[in-house]
Amino acid sequence: MTSLQMPKVDKSVLSNKDKIASDLNKILKSENILSHEDEIRPYETDALAAYKQKPLLVVLPETVEQVSEILQYCNENKIKVVPRGAGTGLSGGALPLADCVLLSMGKFNKILEIDYQNKCIVTQPCVTNLAITHAVQDKKFYYA
């Protein structure tokens, strides 16, 4: 078995942490930007706990427009972004990087549409399996 190879850390991004946080504060309220060790620790891994790495910053957008502005800023400044839903994934898809902005979609937790006839549900990224089950159980449906 080979070891996990993560992308190389961009030291210039690490050294600009305060500026990046300040710039992102033009998009988000300060309480929606996490940078202190104890604040970001819960985000150092998803349910796949074999690999742990604290991100540079965690951002908690509340609107689609904020997500768009964060992505535009990070793209223009060549800052890696790792999106994260509920953090329950087991495949490592939301593993943070030391030089990334972790884009927590935790505030996007609404069920948008339930189509019982076609057995289809449209949700925001942070809706849990249990929330879906609770939403459909009165119609005798169950979701994972």
Report the location of each language-model feature.
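N-terminal accessory segments
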Residues: 1-47, 76-79
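N-terminal glycine-rich flavin-associated loop
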Residues: 12, 24, 49-81, 99, ...
